[in-house]
Amino acid sequence: MFGLGGQELILILMIILLLFGAKKLPELAKGLGKGMKEFKKAQNEMEDEFNKAMDDETPKKKDFGPDRE
């Protein structure tokens, strides 16, 4: 995860705690969770649209009957 170790994550969490205070942390976590959920949803929608567009552009193989030699 971004090349961060345990000590770096603890340091970042302590800085966030000092900046925003203990009372704001649940609100920040909730907002972060919602943001991540919306981002993941948008990412999935874009992937679905891309895959659909690629499927639509792929030429369909037509069946002309039995093979003749």
From Swiss-Prot:
Subcellular location(s) per record: Cell inner membrane
One Pfam match: TatA_B_E
TM regions (residue ranges): 1-21
Region feature Disordered, mapped onto this chain: 49-69
Entry GO terms, CC: TAT protein transport complex
GO molecular function, one term: protein transmembrane transporter activity
Membrane association type: Single-pass membrane protein
The keyword Transport is assigned to this record: yes
GO BP terms: protein transport by the Tat complex
Isomerase is among the record's keywords: no
Keywords attached to this entry: Cell inner membrane, Cell membrane, Membrane, Protein transport, Translocation, Transmembrane, Transmembrane helix, Transport
Job of this protein: Part of the twin-arginine translocation (Tat) system that transports large folded proteins containing a characteristic twin-arginine motif in their signal peptide across membranes. TatA could form the protein-conducting channel of the Tat system.
PANTHER family: SEC-INDEPENDENT PROTEIN TRANSLOCASE PROTEIN TATA
Similarity section: Belongs to the TatA/E family.
NCBIfam families hit by this protein: PRK14861.1, tatAE
Subunit record text: Forms a complex with TatC.
Protein name: Sec-independent protein translocase protein TatA
The encoding gene: tatA
